């Protein structure tokens, strides 16, 4: 697999290099997905597989042989002994005893704990588990252990950062116990600070409190940075405030967007280059950690390249319909603290007269006004409704006020709302004659039976905040079918619906029969409001008044609507969490010409809403056996995307999203093929596996060949 990666990067490891900058880095995401298969030696030479503790949910995996293990051990001893001394010392380990019945609770921490035992003359474990499997700090046990030690014998307290804080430090602070370690004792902790982000405790306060509880100086509390992908290489804190790279390591900082090497003093993603790994391609690893290289010498005379960790690259925001696959479709029930009901109503668009003082009274007044307009709306010809929507769609495209929505699906919406297209939809939905919406007409192929399509009445919409444009598709169809509409928008709406609806004001449309419809009058049948999810009574009022309920959003959002009381004959339409994928049958790939037309359609589907909407696929399954192979179709697709981008411009991409695209490309550099723009505006990823992959967003399409659909 690494050979394939090098070929993809046009790198020949057998040719001389002029700088380590030329070595293509492997992103940590590769070890999360492919770690077990990334062996550089025959599998029979592997002795074990190491996994990270997976603070991000998916553990990294590296496979180890005897040579790698020996190198790791030597590197670790050299670095750590400089900070705690070369002589073995008693180790007070703040974790589960791997020999105990509770060893399963130790999990992936086992490898890290046992790795430090080579520095120990005596070991005690002081994290215990009760009968329910809950961990607690054994205060009495550690006191007894310290009491038995020779007088003045320095010790080393070792543990993971979050365990030291959650189980040890908190337990001591909540009690009257104070421990007094002998002079020269150290506290070393590993694992990083990610699990403590919610605690909002600074490193300085952590060191100070921990030192006070154990009776040592804060300078003797040492945070050791390291990562599974290069196990054995440790970077302890120096008194200067930096970490030092040993003689085994070269550190680079790369720009989060361009991946170019940065000079000292510039903040970037840290890359570590080392000869230590022998059994897997972990010699050049690009981490998700953000840091700064320092080019000045250490004031304490310590050798080695200096760097500081300033944080971790944030994950790209999940923006899909209902947060697609955000938890692999496993939703955990979360208890919500009971909050006092909110009665505030924000009326964002309503052309009627407001009545009432409280939020509930005003909402009831809006509902009554909308229902009063229902008879008028039912008298409007469907041709007039379609015509005026078509005119407004042109305005959405031409008016600069709506330019901020063009890269969020407005172009697609405007084309979809063309009068000819809406007539086609109405004809198909109304048995071939859209005038069934207007009056009783003969049933098809019958002179005795008549048919008329009646509107339901009040349609209430609960809109999502991530892809507002999608909600307009449902609204337009509700208007054409002569329903009055009440929209409850998201707190993230930022006035999008108010702006879109205001475009109707001042527009008129006259049918061929001479009937004129004013957009302002039509907008008297629509209202837009916002109230919080804690405004339970208003949610129940809106739901109980609806003949149609349309809910958009994630599981929690749509479940909230579903739990509201409703009329017995109310129709509920849910656009909740969805998996978005596309399928191409072999018959559709009968020629290069057919494939090019299809590739254009696929690229448009991916680009509309920038994959934030459920209409945009993230995975594409292509049936084998066509004239055009799945891999060739990817090549054609790569030719189509730039043309589509010219039509549907790519919106701003955050550094976090660009990093996510880089990571996904890095994985496929190992296991498949990658096509994509240099600006990360689109990406096609191809591999032989056919599993449904987690969305990356930002026009990243994962293509899978399959034998049969």
Report residues per predicted region.
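Generic macromolecular interface patches on structured domains
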Residues: 12, 62, 82, 86, ...
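N-terminal Rossmann-like NAD(P)+-binding subdomain of aldehyde/semialdehyde dehydrogenases
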Residues: 8-13, 20-23, 332-456
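Active-site phosphate/ATP/adenylate-binding loop shared across adenylate-forming ligases
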Residues: 18-222, 227-230, 234-241, 246, ...
């Amino acid at each position: 697999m690494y050979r394939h990666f090098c070929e993809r990067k046009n790198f020949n490891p057998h040719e001389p290099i002029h700088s380590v900058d030329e070595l293509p880095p492997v992103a940590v995401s590769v070890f999360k997905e492919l770690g077990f298969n990334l062996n550089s030696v025959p599998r029979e030479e592997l002795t074990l597989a190491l996994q990270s503790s997976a603070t991000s949910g998916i553990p990294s995996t590296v496979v180890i042989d005897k040579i790698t293990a020996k190198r790791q051990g030597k590197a670790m001893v050299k670095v750590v002994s400089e900070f705690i001394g070369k002589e073995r010392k008693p180790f007070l380990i703040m974790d589960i005893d791997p020999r105990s019945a509770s060893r399963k609770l130790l999990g992936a921490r086992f490898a890290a704990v046992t790795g430090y035992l080579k520095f120990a003359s005596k070991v005690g474990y002081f994290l215990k588990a009760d009968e329910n499997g809950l961990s607690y700090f054994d205060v009495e046990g550690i006191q007894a252990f310290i009491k038995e030690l020779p007088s003045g014998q320095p010790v080393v307290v070792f543990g993971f950062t979050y365990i030291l804080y959650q189980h040890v430090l908190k337990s001591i602070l909540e009690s009257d116990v104070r421990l007094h370690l002998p002079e020269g004792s150290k506290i070393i902790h590993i694992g990083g600070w990610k699990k403590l982000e919610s605690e909002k405790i600074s490193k300085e306060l952590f060191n100070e409190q921990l030192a006070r509880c154990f009776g040592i100086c804060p300078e003797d509390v040492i945070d050791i940075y390291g990562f599974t992908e290069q196990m054995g290489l440790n970077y302890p804190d120096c008194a200067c405030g930096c970490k030092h790279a040993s003689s085994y390591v070269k550190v680079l900082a790369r720009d989060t967007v361009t991946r170019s090497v940065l000079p000292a003093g510039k903040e970037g993603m840290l890359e570590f280059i080392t000869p230590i790994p022998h059994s897997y391609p972990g010699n050049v690893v690009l981490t998700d950690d953000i840091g700064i290289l320092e080019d000045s010498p250490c004031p304490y005379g310590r050798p080695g390249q200096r760097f500081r960790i300033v944080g971790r690259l944030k994950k790209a925001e999940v923006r899909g319909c209902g947060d697609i696959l955000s938890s692999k479709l496993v939703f955990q029930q979360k208890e919500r603290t009971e909050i006092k009901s909110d009665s505030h109503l924000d009326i964002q668009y309503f052309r009627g007269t407001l009545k009432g003082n409280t939020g509930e009274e005003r909402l009831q007044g809006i509902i009554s006004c909308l229902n009063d307009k229902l008879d008028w709306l039912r008298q409007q010809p469907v041709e007039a409704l379609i015509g005026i929507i078509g005119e407004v769609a042109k305005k959405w495209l031409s008016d600069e006020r709506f330019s901020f929505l063009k890269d969020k699906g407005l172009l697609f919406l405007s084309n979809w709302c063309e009068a000819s297209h809406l007539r086609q939809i109405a004809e198909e939905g109304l048995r071939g004659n859209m005038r069934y919406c207007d009056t009783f007409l003969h049933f098809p192929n019958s002179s005795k039976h008549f048919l008329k399509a009646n509107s339901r009445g009040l349609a209430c919409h609960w809109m999502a905040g991530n892809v507002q444009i999608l909600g307009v598709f449902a609204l337009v169809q509700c208007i054409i079918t002569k329903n009055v509409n009440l929209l409850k928008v998201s707190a993230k709406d930022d006035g999008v619906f108010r702006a879109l609806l205001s475009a109707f004001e001042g527009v008129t449309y006259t049918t061929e029969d001479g009937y004129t419809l004013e957009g302002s009058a039509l907008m008297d049948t629509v209202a837009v409001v916002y109230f919080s999810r804690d405004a339970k009574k208003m949610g129940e009022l809106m739901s109980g008044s609806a003949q149609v309920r349309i809910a958009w959003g994630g599981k929690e959002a749509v479940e909230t609507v579903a739990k509201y009381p409703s009329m017995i004959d109310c129709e509920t339409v849910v656009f909740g969490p969805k998996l978005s994928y596309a399928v191409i049958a072999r018959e559709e790939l009968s020629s290069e010409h057919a494939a090019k037309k299809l590739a254009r359609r696929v690229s448009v589907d991916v680009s509309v809403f920038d994959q934030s909407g459920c209409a945009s696929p993230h995975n594409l399954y292509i049936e084998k056996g066509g004239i055009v192979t799945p891999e060739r179709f990817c090549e054609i697709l790569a030719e189509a995307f730039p043309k589509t981008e010219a039509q549907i411009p790519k919106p701003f991409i955050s550094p976090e999203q660009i990093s996510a695209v880089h990571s996904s490309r890095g994985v496929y550099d190992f296991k498949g093929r990658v096509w994509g723009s240099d600006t990360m505006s689109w990406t096609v990823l191809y591999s032989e596996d056919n599993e449904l992959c987690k969305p990356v967003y930002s026009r990243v399409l994962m293509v899978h060949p399959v034998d049969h659909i």
